[in-house]
A protein has these predicted regions:
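Active-site-proximal beta-alpha core segment in soluble small-molecule metabolic enzymes
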Residues: 72-214
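Active-site loop/helix belt of alpha/beta enzymes
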Residues: 166, 172-290
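Flexible, glycine/charged-enriched surface loops at secondary-structure junctions
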Residues: 69-70, 232-240, 391-394
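Conserved, mostly hydrophobic/aromatic
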Residues: 53, 76, 106, 169, ...
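A charged N-terminal "starter" segment
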Residues: 1-131, 410-414
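Active-site loop ensemble at the mouth of alpha/beta enzyme cores that anchors a bound cofactor
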Residues: 249-340
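C-terminal accessory subdomain/extension
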Residues: 311-414
């Protein structure tokens, strides 16, 4: 059977027979690595192109190194420990997560540098955070805080386990997500954290919700100024300053170029690893600054045509359960008339085969003049828009080489 990377769960659960596979997994009877993705395929499947993963990992780590940044890629994008291993081997500081549960997944798979990029109020979660250095004195696990209530909850948990909670004060902007809305509030939360015995490490924010890179750059500069005012409350020799969605991180780099020498900038971008054919393809900073590098889309979803009920319409057995749709519909990258590994793949002329609509389990294709003729049984290969809501549809994702042969299977932990 094909090796599943980063998965120590039982192969079967709940008494189901071994022939019932986890979503995305190859057929248990399929050959090990080396078979074509369509051999013994249970479509739809999601694949990751290994060469694109390697390329994107190297490009982003080189970018961070070139600009003197620490990189803590957001694990919530893929929740795949095997992909985290790649990022860490390339030089990432650790990982970012959105919740304590996600932090537990990272920790259980050996990653002990973790930033929980949210305020944590759950007592059990805070107690777990506070006890990490007892488990591993070299661990570095932090979370955000943006309220006195959050400070008090963390302090109670810290006392309950005789541990330590390390925090970053989160600063936001009006109409945005979490984070205090003023310098005065930031000072108050920072002072409360220190007075409560928490370990204040620095300041954090999220610029990804701002409308453009120029606005993001100006806002980050303002947050950096507040961080400088709070710096005397940070006892450590070096303070942390964390930012980083996947759309405006070039603005972050500009804004922190003249930062104090004792400040480490921790970038949290996550979507770069797999990139996409839609939302981030349009917004990536590498598109604005091609001299810094370029990313390649790694994700493809393979589905089979099940019906061609009328001229100009084809239905594929791929739907909202299989692809992201919150930031744009999938795009058709290729079709394979005949639908087997031996049939040649065809790239349709631009605009001739498009996704018009998604239902839970159906994709409506619109076909115009010049589109290749589709019949039931043909295979369509889709690119996606927004990787952060693509991975959660799958429990296993197949790694493929550039000739579409399977090289392994990666497990996700949502």
């Amino acid at each position: 059977m094909t090796t599943t990377l980063g998965d120590d769960r039982p192969a079967t659960t709940g008494g189901l027979p071994g022939t019932v596979t986890t979503k995305g997994a190859p057929d248990p009877a399929a050959a090990a690595a080396g078979r074509h993705v369509l051999d013994h395929a249970h479509l739809p499947v999601m694949t990751l192109r290994d060469s694109a993963l390697e390329h994107n990992t190297a490009v982003m780590q080189a970018y961070a190194d070139r600009h003197g940044l620490l990189l803590a890629p957001h694990m919530k994008t893929h929740m795949a420990p095997a992909l985290v291993d790649r990022q860490l081997r390339a030089g990432a500081w650790g990982v970012t997560v959105a919740s304590v549960q996600q932090a537990m997944v990272a920790w259980a798979h050996g990653t002990h540098r973790v930033l929980v990029a949210n305020e944590v109020l759950d007592p059990a979660g805070l107690a777990w955070l506070a006890s990490r250095r007892t488990e591993d004195p070299a661990a570095d696990v932090l979370c955000n805080v943006d309220s006195v209530a959050g400070v008090e909850a963390a302090a109670r948990a810290q006392r309950s386990v005789d541990g330590a909670v390390h925090v970053l004060v989160e600063i936001g902007f009006p109409g945005g997500r979490t984070g205090v809305r003023s310098a005065e509030q930031a000072h108050a939360v920072a002072r409360a954290a220190v007075d409560a015995g928490l370990t204040l490490r620095g300041v954090t924010g999220y610029e990804g919700g701002l409308p453009d890179v120029d606005t993001a750059r100006d806002w980050v500069r303002g947050v950096l100024a507040v961080a400088a005012e709070i710096r005397p409350l940070v006892a450590a020799e070096r303070a942390l300053f964390s930012m980083g969605g996947s759309a405006w991180f070039d603005g972050v780099v500009d804004a922190v170029a003249d930062r104090p020498a004792d400040v480490d900038v921790l970038l949290r971008s996550g979507a770069y690893l797999t990139h996409d054919d839609g939302f981030y393809a349009e917004r990536t900073p590498f598109r604005r600054r091609p001299e810094e590098g370029a990313l390649r889309p790694a994700i493809e979803v393979w589905g089979r045509v099940t019906s061609c009920p009328e001229p100009g319409r084809a239905l594929v057995a791929v739907g909202k359960r299989d692809v992201s749709f919150d930031e744009g519909l999938p795009v058709v990258r290729a079709v394979r008339p005949g639908g087997t590994a031996q049939d040649p793949q065809v790239v349709p002329p631009p605009g001739t085969v498009t996704v018009a609509r998604l239902d839970d389990q159906h994709c409506y294709l619109a076909l115009t003049d010049g589109a290749p003729g589709l019949t039931p049984g043909d295979v369509v290969v889709f690119g996606i828009s927004h990787p952060c809501t693509a991975f959660d549809k799958w429990r296993q994702v197949q790694l493929v080489a550039d000739d579409d042969t399977v090289t392994g299977t990666i497990a996700t932990w949502f």
